């Protein structure tokens, strides 16, 4: 794993860890949070259904924006929008307001995931070597969210979400644009095989 010593690879690692950690911080304990603020089962299901409906609209909008602006600009704009929107999670508790705020923030966060896959696919490394760290980041985000939820405050998960979200934007600008991938030392045929799904576990290492 000599590539792990490369500065660029480390930047990809940190980018994916922070982004997927933010995703976990926002969504993994949201039903527990809603229980703690007094929501019953039907109210929680309503909010989650509303979130899914919003996601259908937002994902199409993100795809269109990506075609117009490119990946880096699209991610930046939508992260800033969802960060501003998610501030309402600290204040709103009503079903409609909380549902709209959470639905928009979560839909944008999840909707950006395919763009991060584009970043991984266009990196000078195999797809699995980058995407693996997203899974690790998500798992770490779940664990950290649980700890700070219990020992700090329930709303601390939203602070973690915002902190990781903004950190991912910082590291987004340290990696090449997807439209202009840098030359890789990896074998092109091997990289293509990995992206298509062949020998995923082997290619991670």
List PLM regions with ranges:
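Juxtamembrane intracellular "pre-TM" segments in multi-pass secondary transporters
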Residues: 1-7, 175-205
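Helix-loop boundary and gating motifs at the non-cytosolic
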Residues: 2-54, 201
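Hydrophobic core of transmembrane alpha-helices in multi-pass small-molecule transporters
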Residues: 17, 85-89, 93-115
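Intracellular juxtamembrane helix-capping segments at the cytosolic ends
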Residues: 30, 109-124
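Residue-level signature of mid-helix packing/kink "hotspots" within the transmembrane helices
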Residues: 52-60, 138-139, 143
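Helix-to-loop junctions at the C-terminal end of transmembrane segments
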Residues: 57-71, 149-150
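Structural signature of the two symmetry-related core transmembrane helices
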Residues: 73-88
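Symmetry-related core transmembrane helices of the 12-TM Major Facilitator Superfamily/SLC fold
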Residues: 156-174
